[in-house]
C-alpha cells in the first residue's frame, strides 16, 4: 500500500467502528482525507484494535512524519551548555523524550483536529498512546494531579518516550501556588526522565495557550527550574525548550542569552 491507500484503509476501518458513520462519504482529496482521519483518531476511545490496523497505521504515521522532516537533537546547537532552543513541530523531534502538556484525564484531546499539543502528540504517536495512558490511569484510579508526571513509550514518534504532565490552569491572576505547580511540572518531568536514565528531554511551553499562563512568566519559571535541576548529577544532560510561536522564541532567546 502507498500512503494514500493506507490512509483510506485507516479511515474506512475507523468508520466501520462507528455505526452512526456508516454512510460517511470519504473525501477524494488528500488534505480533507487527512483531516477526517485525524478527527476519527481524536474521538476514538481507548479500547483495543486489530493488529492489521496497527501495522498499517504505524507505517502510515511514520511515513507522514518522515515527509514532514525529522530534527535530531544531535544536529542542534546549544545556546548554553546543555540548553537548547528550537522552534518547530515537537512531533518531529528526535530525542529521548518530549513533554506533553496533558489534561487531568491524561488520555489525550478528544476534540477533532484541535490545535493543542496534546492532540498533535496523540495523533502522530497513534492510537496506542491513548491505550497506554488509559492503562496508567486505570491503575491510578483518580485524575492526574497538577504538577506531577507520567511516562509512556512514544510509539510512532521519532522520540523514544513521552512525558505527560498537567499544568496549572489560570483563570485570574497568577498565584504563588500556580507558579509552584508549574515549576513542579518541569521538575517532575526531569526527575522521571532521570529515573529512566534518559539524557535528553524536550519541553513544550507548559500551561501557556489553552491554560492561559502568561508566556513570559512561564518561560522564566521553566528556565530557572531546568537550570537548577541540571546542577544535579543525573543522566539528564540536554534540555530543549521547544517553541512554536515567534513570541515564545523571542522570550526564551532573551532569557537564555542573558547569562
Please provide the spans of the model-predicted regions.
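Macrodomain-like recognition of ADP-ribose-binding/processing modules
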Residues: 1-259
